[in-house]
Every structure is written in C-alpha cells, then in structure tokens.
C-alpha cells in the first residue's frame, strides 16, 4: 500500500547529492568481479583497482540500496562476547586478539576516513550505555573497569544524578560513556566509497543480478541479468543478502541481534 506523502527510503538519503554516472555496458572480461556494492564490495574493489587489476562491481539493485546506507551509523569497539567468555572457549591469547579486532576496526575507519578525506560526518561523540536498574548500573560500572584495566578501552561512569548532561532524560539509572566511539553518516560514507572506487576506474553497475558463477580453466564465467562476464577472480560481498547463488556461503550467514 502506498500512502500519499510517505517515502519508503530513509530520510537521510535526502542529504546525498546526485548519484554519479555508473557503468551501462557490461564488459566481456575483467580481472576481478565483485558481487555486491555495499561497504565490503566497494572496499574490496578499491583495493584491487588500486593494485592495477580491472575491476567490475555488480549489484541486483541500486549500489548501496541495502544495509550499508540504512544502518544507524554507530562505530564502536564492541565485540559481543566478553574477554572471559572468549578465553574459556579459545584461550586467553586468542581471546585478546579477537577482542582487539573491535578496537582495530574503530581506529581503521577513523584513520581511513581522515587519510582519504571522506565527507561523511564522522564524529567522535562517545556512546552512552544506559542502565535499566540500579543493579544494572553497578554491573556496567564494574564491567567498564574491567575493560579499562584489561583492554585499555576508555570510559567513564555517569550516575543518575548527572545523567541529564548526557541524555536530557531521567528514564535510566545512570550509565557508562565509552568516549572513543564514533558516529558516521552511513549513506555519505557509502557514497564516498563509491567515489573512491570510480576514481580508481572501477566499473560499477546496478540492477544487474548475478545468476550463476561457474569455474573455468582461466577463472570464472559469471552469468548476469545483462549478459556474461569472464573474470579471473570473483569476490562475493553479499553478506545478509546472500542467496542460493552461493549456497556454501548462504548456509554460513546468520542473523545477529543488534
């Protein structure tokens, strides 16, 4: 059902400029073909193209139609399982490496954005983790102290009496602020990745679904809605939009609660 005056696209997409001109003719052969034009696909394409390999990115919809431009834009150091839980399963050394990936990811995005000069509203605003009960507040403070002492993740506690300076609300029982966490405009970030890809001579085509990938003696034959492409290598970057096109990957993609 369509309602008058209601748009089905996120309102923050209105802050984007005109979509850059994309590829309209499918090349017959490329070094690298990337399936999916979200953050993962474009990031991979930027690297392969800058490395001198002809690169084509295909998407079944508009580039960035999915979660890459529709997420909340929070960038944190969070890896869900605690160091204690990971240590019990993998041992302390591997657990620390897994947890460190969260910190590395935050720093990488910040450094990449600054180095490349991306216009995507990246800001170091911090993240407030709210307590729902007084007991929850004590737990959050204790866990934050462990993160600081064991993993050098900076934070500070905000008791309920000082909460309004962070939220302007008395709805919670205090909380903890992780001061290094950032926010970003997700659609602008994607648009800037698209700009970098096009600048590196990546060919990007939307509304060109890949229907079959077959291995050949020289690489892969990729069948699409608009023709066939020969590729030396194929990168599947479809994440949550993975289909039976790649059943092995489809079986390994699972939803994770936010």
Per-region residue spans from a language model:
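Conserved N-terminal glycine-rich FAD pyrophosphate-binding loop of Rossmann-like flavoproteins
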Residues: 61-98
